[in-house]
């Protein structure tokens, strides 16, 4: 038995046997699938094309980085506002989607593609700057007291998504009913002919009737607004935690896959005993799979994704390109997270992997992958923190596994039943996994602070961390993820990172003089 087998882990340059490789890859695909598909559904891009693009970009990323960085490239939420606000005549893309069943026509996707391709230049430029300036320059601009809390808010800003997925419609229904009841109560108090004009009174009464009608359409007794949805999500969560902690050997490296299987099993039992009204399994909208380059028969088994060519649009470049800046602090935090977790495992073998020094390759790879995804008709993206969490949990850091995950995603995108099966996994199951994964991303931020020895008794460090955490979380939960700053929509994470860099710079003035005085 090899030392690797005893430790039950795989380092970046190690390749599992074929059977294990495929299962590890499938686990990574399941982890990336929800976010990547949701981005496609929100932006109106074709689902199969988006999944194919993420797989293709991941495969290319492996070659671009010399097979040294185990990362999965998936669609990024950072670009949603920019793409949705693009104009098609008098309408925005979001408004067009409401008239086309939620899918953008190919000619509009091609406009967005042009902006996405150019956005890749931003990450490439950042990578070249890092290569020119060296690691010391990067650590001065993005020290651990910046990258650590940035990693933390990446995970914590996703906490709301995890809970809303864990109880998908229960949250929405309860919130809608509470808001509706409150609004009707307020309207009833205001709608008094003695205090308002007849016109205003009529308008308020009409609005009250509309709200009442809408409330009548809210489901009363389905699995989605019952406690059973929590049973599924919590079963998934606890099964995953138990498998991660107590399973040994090969099975101990598949806790997310096994946890998802348990969650699906619980959802299946609820459906079997409760009937159709207790069905948590999902169906992907047919419109999301309608377009294809070529179909076998009616496309119900095999259909090549629909690829579109970009159309020149400088408006798309102006809208999309600046958003790429938001992904740079994320990518930097991700590479430091990965470096810490890989080397924590590598030192048990007497090895060392200097992954942090590959930040330039990582950023350049991200930029080229944006171009590749945009060229075939996929959204812009970034490397996924949830896939890093999966590696940290399973201790499978193998580059061949991520390469295989990319190939697997491309294959799945061509087989309609595969997409339907993976998409059909109940949202509550995904939410159960996300509670663990997104929390793990935040925990990795703490690990960066500990590993780099950041003193929490240093007033500068406390100030930088405090500003990043408060701004990032505050903007995410109060302003919905973006804050308008002189007409520019600044994403929460990017804004927090930039603010943290500025605060760190200002509070570092005079540090060298102070050190010299002490010496």
Go through the PLM ranges and name each one.
Residues 6, 107-273, 404-518:
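Membrane-embedded alpha-helical modules
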Residues 42-45, 88-95, 102-106, 131-134, ...:
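Juxtamembrane helix-boundary/capping and inter-helix hinge elements in multi-pass membrane proteins
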Residues 10-12, 16-18, 41-62, 322-399:
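Membrane-embedded helical hairpins/re-entrant loop segments and their flanking transmembrane helices
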Residues 1-70, 77-106:
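N-terminal signal-anchor module of multipass membrane proteins
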Residues 83-90, 244, 387-402, 407-413:
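Interfacial segments of multi-pass membrane proteins
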Residues 1-23, 172-221, 278-306, 340-361, ...:
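Intrinsically disordered, low-complexity non-transmembrane regions of multi-pass membrane transporters
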Residues 19-35, 224-236, 254-255, 268-270, ...:
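Hydrophobic, membrane-embedded alpha-helices of multi-pass small-molecule transporters
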